[in-house]
C-alpha cells in the first residue's frame, strides 16, 4: 500500500482494513505509523538482499552483477510511487535504518569493485574508498531530488551508473558494458 500510494495517503485505518484486522490489533502490534513503516522497510530491504544473493550466484562477473542489480532497481523504481521514498525521510527511525543500510551497501559495493579489479574489468588506479564517499555515488539520493525526479528512473541510472562504470572500466570491462547497454 505504502509503495503504491505513498506514506501520507495511507492511514492506519487503511492498513487495518487491508490486513483484515481491527485498528486496535494493529496498534497492539505497532505503536504508531513510524514503527509500522520501519518494519515494512525492513521487509523490503530483506527481499532486496535476497535478490542480491541470487544475482551474485547467477552471474559470471562483477559487471554482470552490477547490471543485473541495476535492472532490478529500475524495475522496483517503476513499481513504486516516488512519494514513498520522499515521505519515508520524514520518519527519524526509518532514516536511521536507511543510513545503516547505506553503510552496508557501501561495504558490499567496495567488495564488488575490488572483485572487478581482480577480474581485470575495473581499473586498479582508482581509490575506491574515495569514490564511494563522494555524494555523486549516492544514487539513492537522486531519486528524492525534485530536480532529478522529473526524469524516469532508467534515464537517471543510465546517466549516472553507466557513466561511472565506463570511467572505472578497463578495456575488457568496456566490452562487457557494451554488451549490456
Q: How should each PLM-predicted stretch be described?
A:
Residues 1-18:
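Short, amphipathic alpha-helix enriched in basic
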Residues 39, 50-79, 132-135:
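Hydrophobic alpha-helical connector segments
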Residues 111-119, 151-181:
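C-terminal peripheral helix-coil segments that are non-catalytic and often amphipathic
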Residues 94-121, 129-144:
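Amphipathic alpha-helical packing segments from all-alpha helical-bundle domains
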